[in-house]
């Protein structure tokens, strides 16, 4: 920004306000840096937690003690990161114009109709969805399975919040559209809460 001190017709800018007493949300980082941090944090957290997934705290302590870093030489994420990438790709392709048809088409194109591919892993809600899609059921019927309540949408909802930064209602709306193929009820609400929180 150019200085206005040399231009007589523009009044001098008022003194900067005192720094706030508490921390600034986002730490003064720009939107791109916060988005990158949110998505990298998701992936790193997933890789850190993956070896201990589904273990009881007592089992974790017995095996590793207190975990303060990676516990394997080759950390890798899970389907949580893969499906967050899936949601991010949907947003990159469709943005706020995202519809359930777009989501369902992507499930077929990138996951259900392939024997192998980048979205290899799947939680139980995704497996139920894949089974329904492969049987020819369309959204929202594809989301009617025993695990539609699960956290699968919540695990992939961060990109919606990143995309709709500062607009939690829009982030929640997009998460509900994404989840309409795979989740229902509490499964949708959990994803909306994560997306809105990230936004």
Regions from the PLM with identified roles:
Residues 1-199:
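Structured, active/binding-site neighborhoods that engage oxygen-rich ligands
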């Amino acid at each position: 920004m150019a200085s206005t001190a040399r231009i007589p017709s523009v009044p001098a800018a008022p003194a900067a306000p005192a720094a706030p007493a508490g921390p600034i949300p986002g730490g003064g980082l720009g939107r791109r840096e916060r988005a990158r941090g949110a998505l990298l944090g998701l992936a790193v957290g997933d890789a850190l937690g993956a070896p201990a997934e589904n273990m009881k705290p007592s089992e974790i302590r017995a095996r590793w003690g207190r975990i303060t870093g990676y516990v394997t030489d080759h950390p890798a994420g899970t389907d949580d990161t893969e499906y967050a990438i899936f949601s991010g790709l949907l947003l990159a392709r469709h943005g706020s114009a995202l519809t359930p048809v777009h989501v369902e088409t992507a499930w077929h194109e990138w996951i259900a109709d392939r024997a192998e591919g980048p979205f290899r892993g799947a939680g139980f809600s995704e497996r139920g969805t894949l089974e329904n899609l492969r049987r020819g059921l369309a959204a929202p019927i594809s989301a009617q399975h025993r695990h539609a309540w699960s956290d699968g949408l919540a695990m992939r909802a961060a990109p919606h919040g990143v995309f709709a930064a500062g607009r939690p209602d829009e982030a929640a709306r997009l998460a509900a559209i994404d989840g309409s193929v795979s989740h229902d009820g509490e499964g949708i609400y959990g994803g909306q809460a994560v997306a809105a929180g990230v936004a």
